[in-house]
């Protein structure tokens, strides 16, 4: 008797039924992200979104893509998959707001060794939560089963976003000058960069049980929970600031830390002057530095050190910007440093 297509595919390692099941399970989460601009639902060949250009003179679309990196290994060891999707969204939308843009839509891509519907749904639950936090719609995605290429219990996660900004309001640093103030928006922890070094510092690959320990520095949290704290999404508070303040530059502090990311928003001839004692460094980073015997320079050149995003604003508007941030979900935002003549980052 000839086997059916699904039976043959299943024998090859791809479970079509599991794929259908995962879609059904994730629908409730995706629905949370939909708004009046979304056309159709899941299942189409492309995600449709009606672009409302009201209020835009010259709308410009901006796109971004990123993944979560080896933070996924921590999620797999901890068997906790419902927040890693927030990280994926954050890595993309936090990038596009650096241009002053509002994220509109998001799509996710999951590659896995075996499609376990409940696990896939948990991942998408996090993606949907991230989209809600960023006020954008999850209009599509793909779950690809890769038998023979990936271990059955492993997966990778990436995302893609498209946003919009008025051409005249695209952020540029032309008016940046000495005396402008740099504001810090705190991170929740390591966020989604530097985890290859984190895994080495704590020898996680050889001793995964270390993730279940509760170092005194972490105030009762397990190391795994502290490392899995989802990346903060800064979209809503930053967009509020952009409405009322002349923001001259925004940097998302990701891989490369202060030294690589802050200069990306600086005008040529300007440097970011930051006093080390003014950086509010969470205990987790001190624990990492001490455990791994990492130099201070390497810490600031790899990790966000407690600062997930920086905004540069005129000195006369710094207090106003902080008031807006404090009233819109960033109560611990603070003045980090100033712009001075020079280049790059000056940690003094």
Regions found by a protein language model. Name each.
Residues 28-188:
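Glycine-rich phosphate/pyrophosphate-binding loop regions near the starts of catalytic domains
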Residues 2-12, 119-134, 150-157, 207-211, ...:
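Glycine-/charge-enriched secondary-structure boundary and capping motifs
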Residues 156, 169-220:
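Short, acidic (Asp/Glu-rich) active-site segment that either coordinates a divalent metal cofactor
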Residues 22, 26, 48, 92-93, ...:
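Buried hydrophobic packing segments
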Residues 53-54, 67-68, 162-164, 188-190, ...:
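Short, glycine-/Ser/Thr-/acidic-enriched flexible segments
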Residues 2-37:
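N-terminal amphipathic/basic leader segments beginning at the initiator methionine
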Residues 23, 121-124, 195:
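Hydrophobic face of alpha-helices
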Residues 15, 66, 179, 252, ...:
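Residue-level signature of catalytic and energy-coupling elements of molecular machines
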């Amino acid at each position: 008797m000839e086997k059916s297509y699904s039976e043959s595919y299943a024998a090859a390692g791809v479970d079509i039924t599991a794929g259908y099941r995962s879609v059904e399970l994730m629908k409730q989460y995706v629905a949370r992200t939909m708004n009046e601009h979304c056309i159709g639902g899941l299942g189409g060949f492309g995600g449709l979104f009606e672009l409302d250009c009201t209020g835009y003179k010259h709308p410009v679309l901006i796109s971004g893509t990123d993944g979560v990196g080896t933070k996924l290994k921590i999620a797999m060891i901890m068997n906790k998959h419902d927040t890693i999707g927030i990280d994926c969204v954050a890595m993309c939308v936090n990038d596009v707001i650096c241009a002053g843009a509002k994220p509109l839509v998001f799509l996710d891509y999951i590659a896995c060794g075996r499609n376990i519907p409940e696990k896939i749904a948990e991942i998408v639950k996090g993606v949907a939560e991230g989209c809600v936090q960023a006020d954008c719609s999850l209009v599509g995605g793909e779950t690809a089963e890769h038998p023979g290429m990936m271990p059955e219990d492993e997966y990778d996660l990436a995302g893609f976003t498209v946003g919009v900004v008025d051409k005249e309001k695209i952020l540029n640093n032309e008016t940046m000058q000495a005396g402008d103030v740099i504001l810090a928006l705190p991170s929740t922890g390591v966020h989604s960069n530097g985890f290859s070094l984190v895994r080495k510092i704590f020898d996680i690959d050889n001793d995964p049980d270390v993730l279940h320990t509760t170092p005194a520095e972490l105030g009762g949290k397990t190391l795994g929970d502290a490392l899995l704290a989802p990346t903060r999404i800064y979209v809503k508070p930053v967009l509020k600031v952009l409405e009322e303040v002349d923001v001259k530059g925004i940097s998302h502090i990701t891989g490369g830390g202060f030294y690589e990311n802050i200069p990306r928003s600086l005008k040529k001839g300007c440097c970011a002057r930051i006093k080390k004692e003014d950086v509010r460094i969470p205990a987790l980073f001190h624990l990492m530095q001490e455990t791994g015997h990492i130099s201070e320079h390497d810490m600031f050149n790899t990790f966000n050190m407690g600062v997930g995003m920086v905004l540069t604003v005129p000195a006369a508007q710094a207090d106003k910007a902080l008031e807006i941030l404090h009233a819109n979900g960033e109560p611990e935002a603070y003045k980090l440093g100033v712009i001075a003549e020079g280049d790059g980052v000056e940690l003094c």
